[in-house]
């Protein structure tokens, strides 16, 4: 008599899973959806790159991209909440969590902005430092200003990579932005605030000025334009980074490698439209 083997419920479940795995297309089960958050300055760029990546590799889920500001992205990737954190300022040894790897994907210009009612032609580094540290408080003290009243100073929040980059590039290691400045949580809010206040001054990513509404001020005699930033003439340029916990691996490595691969014309076209390509 032939023996019969009765399958238990766990055996049936495992067999079913194996059957599905064997029937699935190669790589279909291996691909996970990347979760990315962090810098609001980088958000438009990373969203465009995510869309292009999914178009190039339609079997790979498009990364889920969110904002939240640089320090939030860095802390989220360190804690494992996300796969990649976007950072719009350079690594800070002793401040950033241990074990993170920063991969540069692009560069970006930071512009000083005023209200269109106060179209300053130029600001020197000394004047920028005086204004943003609070030592210069009246427009009457600023050469070329059409105003004479108090300066309304706008800043970004402390978790902002743009704030860190602005301080490093424009103010230097020792100076800090005045605590009396009004802090905004995103570039869009910063631009809107300066655009609504004729006495205002602030700073933002070059890409955030493209829709108008504010006046971009020349810095050290050089206009804040994409062309000048690419050529190296304009000094207010910072790096864009994708941050991982340890060396990039899995889907995060594939995405970052695709972005940073020399000769990737798709990426170069996207980056060069509003930012500065690194290849």
Predicted features along the sequence, with ranges:
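Bacterial N-terminal signal peptides
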Residues: 12-23
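Bacterial N-terminal signal peptides that target proteins for export
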Residues: 2-14
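Exported/periplasmic ABC-transporter solute-binding proteins
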Residues: 28-279
């Amino acid at each position: 008599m032939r023996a019969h083997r009765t399958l238990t419920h766990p055996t049936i479940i495992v067999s079913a899973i194996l059957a599905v795995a064997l029937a699935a297309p190669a790589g279909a089960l291996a691909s996970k959806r990347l979760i990315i958050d962090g810098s609001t300055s980088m958000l438009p760029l990373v969203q465009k790159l995510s869309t292009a990546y999914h178009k190039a590799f339609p079997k790979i889920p498009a990364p889920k991209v969110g904002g939240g500001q640089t320090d939030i992205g860095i802390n989220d990737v360190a804690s494992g909440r996300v796969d990649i954190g976007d950072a719009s300022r350079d690594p800070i040894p002793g401040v950033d969590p241990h074990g993170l790897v920063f991969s540069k994907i692009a560069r970006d210009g930071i512009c000083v902005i005023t209200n269109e009612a106060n179209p300053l032609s130029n600001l020197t580094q000394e004047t920028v430092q005086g204004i943003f540290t609070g030592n210069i408080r009246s427009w009457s003290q600023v050469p070329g200003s059409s105003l004479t009243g108090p300066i309304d100073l706008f800043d970004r929040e402390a978790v902002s990579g743009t704030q860190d980059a602005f301080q490093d590039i424009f103010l230097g290691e020792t100076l800090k932005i005045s605590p009396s400045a009004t802090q905004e949580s995103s570039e869009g809010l910063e631009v809107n605030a300066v655009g609504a206040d004729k006495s205002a001054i602030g700073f933002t990513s070059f890409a955030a000025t493209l829709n108008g509404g504010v006046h971009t001020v020349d810095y050290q005699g050089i206009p804040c334009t994409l062309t000048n930033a690419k050529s190296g003439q304009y000094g207010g340029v910072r790096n864009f980074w994708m941050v991982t916990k340890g060396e990039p691996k899995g889907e995060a490595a594939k995405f970052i490698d695709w972005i940073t691969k020399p000769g990737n014309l798709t990426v170069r076209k996207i980056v060069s439209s509003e930012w500065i390509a690194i290849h």
